[in-house]
């Protein structure tokens, strides 16, 4: 299921699989904001490949996992 994950590093959208100690996000997109609204970064950090298959975040660094706004989900899927 596609979810929004807010971590201590940033906000991500993707298919979430929660493990005991980690959250794995498949097909992750990092959410960025500008004066014109929100968008998606080309990678998940400055030096990552442009579209990683997945990222793993330690649960200690996850602030929350929530359902994604339908409009944002539509933009993610495009």
Task: Annotate each language-model stretch with its function.
Residues 1-78:
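Conserved RNA-binding domains used in RNP assembly and mRNA/RNA metabolism
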């Amino acid at each position: 299921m596609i979810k929004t994950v807010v971590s201590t590093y940033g906000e991500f959208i993707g298919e979430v699989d929660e493990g005991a100690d980690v959250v794995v996000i498949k097909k992750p997109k990092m959410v960025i904001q500008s004066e014109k609204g929100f968008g998606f970064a080309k990678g998940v950090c400055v030096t990552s490949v442009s579209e990683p298959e997945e990222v793993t975040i330690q649960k200690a660094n996850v602030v929350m996992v929530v359902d994604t706004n339908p409009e944002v989900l539509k933009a993610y899927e495009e």
